[in-house]
C-alpha cells in the first residue's frame, strides 16, 4: 500500500489572500468552507479577479454568508445575465460548524473573518478564522517583530 501524501496550500493553489486579516486580528481557530458560486464567478476566480480585503463573514438564521467579497466579472461574461460583483455568497458548512462559530462569535470581541481563497480538488474553498481584534500596541509589536526578522535575514545574508 502506498501512503497518499496530503497536498499543502501552495502559491499556485491560493487564489486570494486577506493579508489585512492577520494584521488586524489574532486568529484563534481556522476552518475551511465551500462557496456557493455562479458560473461566471468561477471563471473570474480562475483568472484571479477577486478581492477579500473588505470581506467579512456573517452568521444569520443558521447560515453563514460571505459579505463584501468582490469578484470582478470577466469582460467576456455572458450578456444575458447581469453579474453583481459584490453579491452576498453563501458559505457551505455543517450545522455543527455553524453552531460552534455562532457560539464563539457571540462572545465579546470575537468575529469571523475570511483568510484566503484557494482551490482544493478543483473546488473553490474559503479559509475562515475565528478572530479577536488586536489593539494598537499589539499591531506595533507585530510590526516591530517583522522588521527585526527582516533585518536579521539581511544580516545573515551579508555575513555569508
From Swiss-Prot:
InterPro entries: SmpB, SsrA-bd_prot, SsrA-bd_prot_CS. Keywords: Cytoplasm, RNA-binding. Residues 151-160 have a biased composition (Basic residues). It is found in: Cytoplasm. Residues 130-160 are annotated as: Disordered. The keyword Cell membrane does not apply. One of its GO terms (biological process) is trans-translation. GO terms for molecular function: RNA binding. Pfam families: SmpB. One of its GO terms (cellular component) is cytosol. Coiled coil: none annotated. SUPFAM superfamilies: Small protein B (SmpB). It comes from the Bacteria. Transmembrane segments: none annotated. The keyword Cytoplasm applies. Its main location: cytoplasm. Residues 139-150 have a biased composition (Basic and acidic residues). Required for rescue of stalled ribosomes mediated by trans-translation. Binds to transfer-messenger RNA (tmRNA), required for stable association of tmRNA with ribosomes. tmRNA and SmpB together mimic tRNA shape, replacing the anticodon stem-loop with SmpB. tmRNA is encoded by the ssrA gene; the 2 termini fold to resemble tRNA(Ala) and it encodes a 'tag peptide', a short internal open reading frame. During trans-translation Ala-aminoacylated tmRNA acts like a tRNA, entering the A-site of stalled ribosomes, displacing the stalled mRNA. Belongs to the SmpB family. This is SsrA-binding protein. It comes from Alkalilimnicola ehrlichii (strain ATCC BAA-1101 / DSM 17681 / MLHE-1).
